[in-house]
Amino acid sequence: MSLLDYFRSTKKPNTASLAKERLQIIVAHQRSGRGGGAPEYLPKMKQEIIEVIRKYVQISEDQVSVQLDQNDDNLSVLELNVTLPDTK
C-alpha cells in the first residue's frame, strides 16, 4: 500500500523553499532601490493614473501605489496596486 500512497500523495509546499523564494523577492526589491531611485517620470505617471481612476471611482492618493522594479536581466516590472472602495 505504501507504494500506491507515494503516487497518490500531493506534495505540500515546502516552507523552506517558500521562505527562500520570499527572501529572494525582498533582496531583489532592496537591490533595485539602491540603483539611483525611481525614474523621473514615475510621479507624473502615478498622478495621471489616479486621475483616470477618479473618473470612475472616488479614491485618495494613498490608495494607489506605483512601483518600478528592475533586475539585472534588463527587465523592468511596473507594479500598480489600487485599493478600491467596497461597493454595496
From Swiss-Prot:
Give the HAMAP family listed for this entry.
Answer: MinE
The answer on whether this UniProt entry bears the keyword Cell cycle reads yes
Name of the protein in its database record: Cell division topological specificity factor
Q: What organism does the UniProt record list as the source?
A: Shewanella denitrificans (strain OS217 / ATCC BAA-1090 / DSM 15013)
Asked whether the keyword Cell membrane is assigned, the reply is no
NCBIfam families cross-referenced by the UniProt entry: minE (TIGR01215), PRK00296.1 (NF001422)
Its annotated function is as follows: Prevents the cell division inhibition by proteins MinC and MinD at internal division sites while permitting inhibition at polar sites. This ensures cell division at the proper site by restricting the formation of a division septum at the midpoint of the long axis of the cell.
The stretch of residues making up the signal peptide is none
Q: Which GO terms describe its biological process?
A: cell division; regulation of division septum assembly
Name of the gene: minE
A Pfam family this protein belongs to? MinE
The cross-references to Gene3D superfamilies, in alphabetical order and at most eight, read: Cell division topological specificity factor MinE
The UniProt family comment states: Belongs to the MinE family.
Alphabetically list the UniProt keywords: Cell cycle, Cell division
InterPro entries, A to Z: MinE (IPR005527), MinE_sf (IPR036707)
Name the domain of life this protein comes from: Bacteria
